[in-house]
Structure formats: structure tokens, C-alpha cells
């Protein structure tokens, strides 16, 4: 009886934790819808006054209409938001604006200074923002000097948390892990024949959707399950012969970590990924003309499970025949 009580209590606690994390993902969009009718601006603390004015102009700031206080991302704020050691020498130039969009509008990200955001593309930001729980919003990024752009999302986290969103650390960690994986792989392959950043972004969107679908139907996924999803998806997008084994493992590690996250319990997660995929494909011209866009990486796991079930049933039937 005592054992049963402890097991029941553990199950209740696990359920509560799951619901809280899923609720946090939902709260992201709810707060955006309720609070960001006027845009909010987060500026890097390393900007000079001239750079600050220049960046605000790039972001579309209008002092007569944008009456919210400007926020500043300092090294101290960054360390608290990202749960890392405080480094006072950290240079923060990337700045961002976030504003709500209508419910039927897809997530938008625009880099106003693409010449200065050297490592992260608009679609990489969009992919990571979906992982964070953003469904429909307009995010704008700018920097006055060349920077990688990897810290820009931290400004979005800061803004959201300042407005009451309780972002689980795992959601932020996953979004940053994804952003780093995408930007590193893109940077390492940008001059390689056969590589296409659009295909990489769509492949990752498909991988995330397949992981969510597989977890819903199968429960906990093994690393082999996730590996199968990743490898089959990269092959479908003709990236399997382009990316290295180490890069594949980076994607697998991210996808496996994602499979354990409660962000997948957000019912709008896969819909937002579908919208993201469709918009990338629509803007990419003929890059996807020879690609199966209806490919389902989850099917391979289901087929594998069916084969194992058939083998197991055959074994049972074999032994039953002796008992008859």
C-alpha cells in the first residue's frame, strides 16, 4: 500500500511538472498576444549612443508611438537569463524588437542588418523561436557592427520574462542549442557543393515535427529512434552526403534532448513548424523541386515497430503450436 502511494504520488508530480512546462509554452504566445500590441525593444549594452540611435532606426523605432521603456541587455542580465557565469567583459551589440501578429499570421523574423549578423539567418531564428514556444509574432534583429547574432534571442527571452512569462530553462537551452547547431553547420558547409541552408532549416523543422509525432504515438523515444528520424530526413533532403558525421550527431543530440522536453506537449507546436516549413519552401524558388515534401520520417519507426511485433508474434505462435 505504501509503495503504491509513493508510485501514485510520483506520477502526480510528473504530470504536474509536464502540465506546467506545457503551460509555459502556451503562456509565451498568450503574453505576446496580450502585451505586445506595441512592440518592445531590447538593446545590447555595448552600443554607443550613436550606435543605439542607429540601431533603433533600423528596428523601426518611433518615439511618438512606441511609448514602452527601452530595455537593455547587460552582461549581468544575460547571465541570469541564460543561467551562465557573469562575464563583465561580454560585448553585447545584437538588438531585437518583438511585436504581436494576428492569430492567422505565421511567425516572422527579419534581420535589418544582414551584413552585420554574420552567422545566423532569419529562418534559423524562426526555427529556434518555435522551439521556445512562439507561434505568431514579428521579431526584428539588428546590429551596428559585425557580430554572430547568437545572443539576439536572449533579448527576446529577457523581454518575455520581464512581462511575466515563466520560461523553463530547458526551453531556453534547447532554443540556444538549436540555434548554435544550425549556425555552426551552415557556417562550416556554406561553400560546399550540394549544401543548401533552406534545406537544412526545413529538414530540422521536419525532424522536430517527426519527434513530436513519434513521442505522441510511441511514448519515450530511444536514441536509435531519433537517429533514424534524423538520418532519414537528411537523406530525403539530399544533405546526407554533405554534412559530416559529427554534424549529424549534433542534430541527433539536439533532437534527442527535444524528445525529452515538454515543449512537445504544446498542441500548436507541429502546426507552427508546418507554417514555418511552407513559408521557407515558398520563398526558396526551385530549391525543393526534386524533394519529397510529404516525406514522413516517423513512418520508418512505425514500420520497424510493426516488424518487431510480427517477429515476436511469430515466436509466440511457434511455441503455442507445441502446446496444442
Feature-to-residue mapping (PLM):
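Second-shell loop/turn segments in exported
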Residues: 39-43, 109-116, 139-146, 190-193, ...
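Charged, long alpha-helical assembly modules
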Residues: 231-324
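Sec-dependent signal peptide cleavage junction
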Residues: 18-32
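Soluble oligomerization/assembly scaffold segments of membrane-associated complexes
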Residues: 130, 135-241
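Signal peptide-directed extracytoplasmic domains
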Residues: 79-134
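Positively charged n-region of N-terminal signal peptides that target proteins for export
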Residues: 1-5
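Bacterial N-terminal signal peptides
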Residues: 9-17
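Extracytoplasmic strand-loop-helix segments at the start of, or within, the mature domains
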Residues: 29-102
Amino acid at each position: 500500500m505504501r509503495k503504491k502511494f509513493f508510485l501514485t504520488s510520483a506520477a502526480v508530480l510528473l504530470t504536474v511538472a509536464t502540465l506546467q512546462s506545457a503551460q509555459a509554452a502556451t503562456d509565451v504566445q498568450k503574453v505576446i498576444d496580450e502585451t505586445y500590441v506595441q512592440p518592445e525593444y531590447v538593446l545590447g549594452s555595448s552600443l554607443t549612443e550613436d550606435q543605439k540611435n542607429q540601431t533603433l532606426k533600423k528596428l523601426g523605432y518611433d518615439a511618438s508611438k512606441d511609448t514602452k521603456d527601452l530595455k537593455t541587455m547587460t552582461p549581468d542580465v544575460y547571465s541570469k537569463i541564460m543561467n551562465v557565469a557573469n562575464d563583465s567583459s561580454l560585448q553585447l551589440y545584437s538588438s531585437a524588437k518583438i511585436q504581436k501578429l494576428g492569430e492567422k499570421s505565421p511567425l516572422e523574423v527579419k534581420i535589418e542588418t544582414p551584413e552585420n549578423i554574420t552567422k545566423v539567418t532569419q529562418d534559423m531564428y524562426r526555427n529556434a523561436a518555435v522551439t521556445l514556444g512562439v507561434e505568431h509574432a514579428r521579431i526584428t534583429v539588428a546590429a551596428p557592427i559585425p557580430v554572430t547574432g547568437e545572443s539576439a534571442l536572449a533579448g527576446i527571452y529577457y523581454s518575455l520574462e520581464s512581462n511575466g512569462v515563466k520560461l523553463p530553462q530547458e526551453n531556453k537551452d534547447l532554443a540556444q542549442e538549436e540555434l548554435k547547431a544550425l549556425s555552426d553547420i551552415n557556417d562550416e558547409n556554406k561553400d560546399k557543393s550540394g549544401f543548401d541552408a533552406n534545406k537544412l532549416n526545413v529538414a530540422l523543422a521536419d525532424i522536430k515535427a517527426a519527434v513530436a509525432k513519434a513521442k505522441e504515438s510511441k511514448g519515450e523515444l530511444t536514441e536509435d529512434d531519433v537517429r533514424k528520424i534524423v538520418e532519414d530526413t537528411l537523406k530525403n533532403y539530399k544533405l546526407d552526403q554533405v554534412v559530416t558525421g559529427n554534424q549529424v550527431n549534433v542534430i541527433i543530440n539536439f533532437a534527442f534532448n527535444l524528445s525529452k522536453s515538454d515543449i512537445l506537449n504544446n498542441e500548436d507546436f507541429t502546426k507552427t513548424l508546418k507554417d514555418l516549413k511552407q513559408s521557407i519552401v515558398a520563398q526558396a524558388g526551385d530549391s525543393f523541386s526534386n524533394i519529397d515534401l510529404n516525406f514522413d520520417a516517423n513512418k520508418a519507426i512505425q514500420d520497424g515497430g510493426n516488424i518487431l511485433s510480427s517477429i515476436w508474434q511469430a515466436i509466440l505462435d511457434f511455441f503455442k503450436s507445441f502446446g496444442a
